[in-house]
Design a protein with these regions (language model features):
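Polar, low-complexity loop segments and adjacent catalytic/binding residues used for recognizing
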Residues: 202
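Active-site-proximal segments of metal-dependent phosphoesterases and phosphodiesterases across multiple
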Residues: 216-221
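His/Asp/Glu-rich, glycine-adjacent segments
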Residues: 2-196, 205-212
Length: 221
């Protein structure tokens, strides 16, 4: 109401994108100015930090910024989310001014590229999926460059016309990428290595995107 406009749930103009080059204050990165500032209550992770007098380490990860930020709360040590412009995971200056070395190394492995060279296909023969609708439904969203919404999906062919690195958020490989980040986070941050409870929040986003694009009874979901 004070601004006279709608606001994004995690927007915060006082903080900036932090990537492998450090703090990015250029206005072209304003969509990465994110924090939990707009959350008006505490979270379970905040209460854990208070209970342990900040000894607990709390980190949130997700493809979506809001999926990483809000579950990990106001007092999180870090929240990392996906940058669809280059396939890297980033954060904001709310948490830090430079990425940890383990995350820079993870980004440099370009796992999103290798996953986007794959083909999205069913695990079982498609006729085994008897509790979903037909594969080619008129209600399903089509990827650009593909005439029908049917398996298989050649991601290497589709990525150029469908947002390049952004495509991975709309296919199961996005969940695979996040799982790889989860494993790297546990190791890189030494989570769970002492008597104090740590908390890693994980929000898988690709399932949500696939549901929106194809429907809850689709073969894809």
């Amino acid at each position: 109401r004070e601004l006279g406009r709608s606001i994004y749930c995690a927007e915060d103009s006082t903080v900036f994108l932090v990537d492998h080059l450090g703090v990015q204050k250029d206005k072209k990165f304003k969509n990465f100015s994110r924090s939990p500032k707009n959350n008006l209550t505490t979270t379970i992770t905040d209460e854990l930090k208070l209970f342990t007098n900040q000894r607990s380490k709390v980190i949130g990860v997700s493809l979506k910024d809001r999926g990483a930020i809000f579950p990990s709360g106001h007092l999180a040590n870090a929240a990392y989310w996906y940058n669809p412009n280059n396939g890297h995971f980033v954060t904001s200056s709310y948490y830090m001014n430079k990425l940890p070395q383990w995350l820079i190394k993870f980004n440099n492995k370009k796992k999103s590229d290798s996953l986007l060279n794959q083909t999205w296909k069913t695990l079982l023969p498609i006729e085994k999926y008897i509790h979903s609708e037909i594969d080619d439904s008129s209600f399903e969203k089509k990827f650009k460059g593909k005439q029908l919404s049917i398996f298989p999906y050649d991601l290497k062919t589709l990525r150029k016309e469908n947002g390049n690195y952004k495509l991975i958020t709309h296919v199961p490989q996005g969940n695979t990428l996040l799982t790889e980040l989860v494993k790297a986070t546990i190791k890189g941050e030494n989570l769970g290595r002492n008597e104090t409870t740590d908390f890693l929040t994980i929000s898988y986003s690709s399932t949500d995107y696939v549901g929106h694009n194809f429907g809850i009874r689709s073969k894809e979901l």
